[in-house]
Amino acid sequence: MPIFHAHDGTELAYRLLGKGAPLICLPGGPMRAGAYLGDLGGLSAHRQLVVLDLRGSGDSAAPEDPTSYRCDRLTDDIEALREHLGEERIDLLAHSASGNLASLYAARHPQRLRTLTLVTPGTRAVGITVTDGDWLEASELRREEPWFADARAALDDFLAGRSSDRAAVAPFAYGRWDETARAHAAAGPGQTNSAAAPVFYQDGVFDPAATNAALAAVTAPVLVLAGEYDAGPTPDRAAELVALFPDAEFVVQRGAAHFPWLDDPGAFVRAVAAFLDPEVHSVQAGGTRLAHRVWGDPSAPPVVLAHGRCGDSRTWIPIAERLAAQHRVYAFDFRGHGLSDWPGRYSFELFRDDLHAFLEARNLAGATVIGHSMGAAAACLLAVREPGLIGRLVLEEMPPPFPLDPPRARAERPDGELDFDWPVVPSTDAQLNAPDPDWSERLGEITAPTLVIGGGPTSRIAQEELIRLAGRIPDGRFVTIDAGHLVHTDRPEEFLAELRAFGLS
């Protein structure tokens, strides 16, 4: 493991996982070695993780002065690591008890932070107390678990001071109490410096009033990620922490407790990776986090790009960069795609609702909406339901709202990892085979000028059905670009030319 020296000469170790821009990761415990973080559910595929072993834990040396285990003094070790890495500013992630440490570092060195990610963070440093009531309330969410009765009895004993057996209440710390969680919990005592842990929280370590005043001046973006089932902190307590920062995002990971990268690695990585990517933003739209990219002058006329099935906002980047010369361009990831939430339930109506919620969240009424394939279907359904919300509508290779003959056969999931949630495919295939008759019967209610673009004879979409679709829209017209299904990616110049002819400058 690489080593460096703290300002007092203590030798400190860290692990490097993955490639890319460094993300310093602080383990919790307190004073637990960083090994329990693993690669944070695969976050190392997006950033190089610099996982620090706090002094006296893991492969880091014990200091000569044991009072240097105090949380307020450990901020100097983060600063020494920043200097060692040669970084002017750092991206910092902290879990659990080290949320306190990261908050103190942010208060003392705000100019050194590029971003701050707080994962199920400790909140003592800012004066937010996790109460016995929080533990009991969170435990009630797990009442249907087979282990609940024994764990709840142990929790009652623990809170009443009749027991100090943390292992008995460990199931509450995990969204799934399976073999992986059991092994993770069992490793905890051997990874923790139990003598140093009390010093971390020593009396006088925290000055919440001073810390909170300093955090109010932190300009770096902050992500606070809470677990739905976590007690320390509960989502409500985590929301109090969010309010202390001027520029903070808040994510509650569903089905997760205190170790969210174990409970659902994909959900955790998508949320954190979206936050850390400077080109990606997130909005909460209808209860779903939607990741999106933005180009162009904020005062320019807005254009929203909706991707097709199994794609994401990146498929639009070349087109978006061209449109951004005279438009404010937004491209977002639908649920179940890219870096947005993957809730597991999908339908064209839900994708329609994603688009609607995104337009409302970004105040984009009257925008031009350009949709490809599935995204076009979502836009079409929205234009029917909300006349006047969309200014102009472009439907590229939209699956026609007429029954397929023959119907699509059952699709087999490809091997390996996917950039989308596989249940999207069978869910939408079922709807394409037998669409709601209302979809086609209400096409005449669309008031937006509409351009329907077909990919010609090499497309898998029946072009005569697209002509039929355009004919049912009062202000609709149909054009062909001989490109197959991926018109905007395979024939971008012709695609842009048709947009200009349609009225987009």
Language-model features: locations:
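Conserved alpha/beta-hydrolase catalytic His-Asp/Glu region
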Residues: 151-200, 204, 401-450, 456-457, ...
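Conserved alpha/beta-hydrolase "acid-adjacent" motif
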Residues: 231-237, 459-465
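Active-site loop/oxyanion-hole signature of alpha/beta-hydrolase fold enzymes
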Residues: 54-97, 262, 270, 293, ...
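Gly/Ala-rich beta-loop-alpha elbow adjacent to hydrolase catalytic centers
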Residues: 94-98, 102, 371, 375, ...
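Conserved HGGG/HGGXW glycine-rich cap/lid loop of the alpha/beta-hydrolase fold
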Residues: 6-67, 291-341
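Catalytic active-site module of serine/aspartate enzymes centered on a nucleophile-bearing elbow/loop
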Residues: 248-279, 476-505
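Flexible "cap/lid" loop of the alpha/beta hydrolase fold
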Residues: 115-157, 380-385, 391-417
